[in-house]
């Protein structure tokens, strides 16, 4: 769309950036309403099997994966081999495949499929974070299995299993300290409450 997206800690922060663009850099920008950057996550462990099969005349598609998805903390005490774990950007992938149930060359495609699925969200299409996946079994077909089949199986598998894993919407939360004269205390508390603020003391 040719848009440039600016991000900040709140509306005031964004207004200051836009003001500086106009004042210091002489950039006249059409600015839309700010959007809150939500995220999604899951809150429960779920085991799932995804069997991806397609037959269309010639060579078909086949991939079979069995995995467990859970919040990353669920795997904190994982006692398997550490070299089977890869972790980045709020996503943990544990490969427990042994004995060639899924050939080694297809494992990166499974991981890639899960990572791509995280970008599309579960409930509201916001990026998903804090998710761990433990791939523990599966099968393949000598002719019909390929990298794309396993990538698609992972995408579909995440979508189908995440719905059962108690998905939750996350929103940005900030901790602030407010100092105000006593006569304005009621107004300030009312304003904070209207914005779903939680007053601690």
Predicted regions and their residues:
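Accessory interaction regions appended to the cores of large information-processing enzymes
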Residues: 1-201
């Amino acid at each position: 769309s040719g848009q440039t997206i600016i991000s900040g800690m709140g509306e005031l922060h964004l207004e200051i950036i836009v003001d500086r663009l106009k004042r210091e850099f002489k950039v006249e920008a059409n600015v839309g309403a700010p959007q809150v950057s939500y995220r999604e996550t899951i809150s429960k462990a779920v085991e799932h099997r995804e069997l991806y099969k397609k037959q269309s005349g010639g060579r078909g598609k086949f991939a079979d994966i069995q995995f467990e998805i859970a919040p990353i903390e669920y795997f904190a005490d994982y006692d398997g081999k550490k070299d089977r774990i890869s972790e980045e950007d709020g996503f943990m992938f544990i490969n427990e495949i042994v004995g060639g149930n899924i050939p080694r060359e297809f494992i990166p495609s499974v991981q890639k499929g899960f990572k791509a699925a995280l970008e599309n969200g579960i409930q509201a299409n916001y990026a998903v974070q804090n998710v761990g996946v433990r791939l523990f079994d599966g099968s393949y077909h000598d002719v019909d299995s390929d990298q794309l089949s396993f990538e698609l199986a992972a995408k579909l598998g995440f979508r189908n299993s995440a719905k059962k894993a108690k998905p939750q919407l996350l929103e940005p939360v900030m901790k602030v300290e407010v100092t105000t004269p006593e006569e304005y205390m009621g107004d300030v508390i009312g304003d904070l409450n209207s914005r779903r603020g939680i007053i601690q003391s």
